């Protein structure tokens, strides 16, 4: 088996319940890299927040590249390269939010390692605390002046079926977006061209590595296409 790269999701896979990487895992990563195998992170988190957490997770200096925001970002530490692909327009984000405005949920957009939300509640507070990320409550009419990589809907896990059901009624003839349950409490909207596998394929191609030469680990629906 010609494995030239290993990639791993963050939450529920790479991190323990204490929000660190186990010492045995770190040792395995270092051993693989010593043999010339690249180690990357493929996550729904944005690339900035991953970079900001390397030290606290205990993997500083162990990462070669990050595929962030579900596949729309590539942050390559070897090539010192960053690129962002496929965003959602401000008008589309507003329309999506309006579609769920009467429901028990909140919305958030992660930008430059910070979670931005239109209101303060337990949903955004718990998410920020769990991920160890700063959050800010802002006026989204003012905030949404540029495209963003994705919009996240936060809700109670028991309420997720209702969010998914409502999503089936969302239609827009001018814009396209795809949506996916990424954790028990997160429902995410992204450009339909975005997926972890497409982002990973592009990141690997920068090093002339094929998908068949990559071993991937994950635990959620958006990790499945990486493992096919």
State where each predicted segment sits.
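Asp-based phosphoryl-transfer active-site loop
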Residues: 2-19, 227
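Short loop/turn microsegments at loop-to-beta-strand junctions
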Residues: 2-4, 62-63, 217
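Hydrophobic packing within well-folded, soluble alpha/beta domains
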Residues: 6, 29-32, 39, 200, ...
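Residue-level marker for buried hydrophobic side chains located in beta-strands
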Residues: 6-8, 67, 216
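Conserved Rossmann-like nucleotide-cofactor binding loop
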Residues: 13, 47, 222
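Active-site phosphate-binding/coordination module
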Residues: 23-123
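Short active-site oxyanion
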Residues: 36-40, 64, 150, 212-213, ...
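Conserved acidic, metal-coordinating active-site core of Asp-based
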Residues: 99, 103-226
């Amino acid at each position: 088996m010609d494995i030239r790269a290993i990639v791993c999701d963050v939450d529920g896979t790479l991190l323990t319940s204490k929000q660190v990487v186990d010492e045995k895992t770190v040792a395995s990563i270092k051993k693989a890299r010593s043999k010339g195998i690249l180690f990357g992170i493929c996550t729904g988190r944005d690339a900035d927040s991953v970079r900001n957490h390397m030290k606290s997770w205990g993997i500083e200096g162990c990462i070669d590249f990050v595929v962030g925001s579900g596949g729309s970002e590539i942050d390559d530490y070897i090539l010192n390269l960053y690129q962002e692909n496929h965003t959602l327009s401000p008008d589309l984000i507003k329309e999506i939010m309006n579609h769920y405005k009467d429901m028990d949920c909140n919305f958030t957009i992660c930008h430059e390692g910070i979670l931005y939300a239109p209101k303060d509640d337990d949903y955004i507070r718990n998410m920020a605390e769990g991920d160890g990320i700063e959050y800010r409550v802002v006026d989204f009419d003012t905030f949404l002046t540029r495209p963003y990589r994705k919009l996240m809907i936060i809700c109670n896990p028991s309420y997720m079926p209702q969010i998914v059901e409502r999503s089936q009624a969302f239609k827009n003839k001018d814009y396209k977006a795809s949506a996916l349950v990424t954790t028990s409490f997160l429902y995410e909207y992204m450009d339909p061209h975005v997926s972890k596998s497409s982002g990973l394929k592009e990141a690997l191609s920068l090093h002339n590595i094929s998908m068949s030469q990559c071993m991937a680990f994950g635990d959620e629906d958006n990790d499945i296409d990486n493992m096919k």
